[in-house]
Amino acid sequence: VMKNQTKIRSAKLQILFAVLILTLLAAVGWNVTVARAESGAERFDQQMQPILGSYLRIGDALSSDSLTGVRKNAESIVKLAAALDSASVSGEHAAHYKNVPANLEKAARTLSKAEGLEKARESFKKLSQPMAMWVSMSKPKDVDVVYCSMSKASWVQKHGKVRNPYHGAKMLECGEIVGGDSHQGHEH
């Protein structure tokens, strides 16, 4: 009877050990999958940083009623967007990331050819769509998505006071922060 109880205990311990090992392997496998998905998105987000810089410079110029640097920065976005690799992104937002490079490249190309402040602002609306989507997904630090109900359009800007690129000095603070680090804004 003692031998049987010892064998039963030994078998139970082996089963418990096997379950524990399988659970740990499943957890490690899951974490490896998550890490791979995050590294693809992280790599994409790193590639987006110079694009974000050029985009923010365009927004600053337009909010100051200026075209200075707009064409140069738009051309830079065209080149940088062509080199983006969204194929490595997997997980929840993979389908959204997939379209960002082509949408950025097309909108930036149009903006680089825009003549005059009003046409540049209209083209900037199209460029802002994939940028706002990306910022909403990746949440880069100190960057907000702002919406202007007067323009019926969003844009991305550095965290701080709203500076409307679609109306400039006429309605510089028209907009509401709807995403990013802050959710407070000034709305008309």
Label each region the model flagged:
Residues 4-22, 29-30:
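Bacterial N-terminal signal peptides that target proteins for export
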Residues 14, 24-188:
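Intrinsically disordered, low-complexity terminal tails/loops enriched in metal-binding residues
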